[in-house]
Each structure stands twice: as C-alpha cells, then as structure tokens.
Amino acid sequence: MSKVTVDLQMAFDGTGVPSKTLFEAWAEAAWQGENPTEVTIRIVDNDESRELNHQYRGKDKPTNVLSFPFEAPAGITVPLAGDLVICAPVVEQEAREQNKDAVAHWAHMVVHGMLHLQGYDHIEVNEAEVMEALEIRLLAQLGFANPYEAEETEPDS
C-alpha cells in the first residue's frame, strides 16, 4: 500500500504535464511521515497561480509551487498533508531558463512542496540548508541531479 494518496486536479489545458504515476512517485519519495497521508496536487495556469500567490503571499505574479498544509481542528485526526498548487507554465519556463530537464524540475517542485507541507522552510539560512540538502538527497534517490547546481532562481513558495 502506498504511503501517499495523490488527488491530481488538472486546471491547465496545456501540454507537458507529467503523469499521475510520476506525481505519486515523487510525493511518496518526499513523504517523511510514518503514517499514510493524502495530498491534492492542482496543476494551474498563470492566472490562477498569480491570483493565489497574491491572495496568500502578497505577490502579484505567478509562482512555481504554492503549499497549503492541512490544519485539522483541535481533536480531529485526518490523514491529509495538504494541497500543492503547481503552475505548469512557470515550471516549464524555469526549466528552459535554467537549462534543466523539465521532468526533473517538475519532480523538484513536488518534492519541494511536499517538504513545505511537512513543516520545512527556507526563510532562514540554516533552515534553507537543511531543506535543500534533503531535497538534493530525495531527488538523487529518484535519479535526478542536484537542482541547485547552476540554478538562476530558487523555488519561491
């Protein structure tokens, strides 16, 4: 049985989005919890990403991945990690600009977002170092190169 159930929502009509099987593998690899969980991964366009980024982060531009951890009411235990909102056009554009394989960049965004759902952050330097080291290790286990080598922009969620 899988540790992570992925609810994949497609709100993007374009091409280049990886398969649900890949999203499941990446989310599973990044899940550090002992118990099974569920995550919603919503693939969106620039408009929806910009709107959510503006509403929740005060930034009026689309972004690669937004993470929304599930916060259960007191006394209620539900196996939900939360939601990831990934902007397909931004991920594809970043991959081109950074000369990265698009699938590798998609995997990085899922791993990055899943770690955010588990409380990891990159605001403080020491937290960023811990999170990035874990991302590098998890992506290597999935067969991908270090995403931070020669990177021009960082994940912005």
UniProtKB/Swiss-Prot annotation:
It comes from the Bacteria. Its EC number is 3.1.-.-. It is found in: Cytoplasm. Zn(2+) binds at residues 112, 116, 122. GO terms for cellular component: cytoplasm. InterPro entries: MetalPrtase_cat_dom_sf_prd (IPR023091), YbeY (IPR002036), YbeY_CS (IPR020549). GO terms for molecular function: metalloendopeptidase activity; RNA endonuclease activity; zinc ion binding. The keyword Nuclease applies. Keywords: Cytoplasm, Endonuclease, Hydrolase, Metal-binding, Nuclease, Ribosome biogenesis, rRNA processing, Zinc. Its cofactor is Zn(2+). Binds 1 zinc ion. It comes from Marinobacter nauticus (strain ATCC 700491 / DSM 11845 / VT8) (Marinobacter aquaeolei). Belongs to the endoribonuclease YbeY family. This is Endoribonuclease YbeY. GO terms for biological process: rRNA processing. Single strand-specific metallo-endoribonuclease involved in late-stage 70S ribosome quality control and in maturation of the 3' terminus of the 16S rRNA. The keyword Protease does not apply.
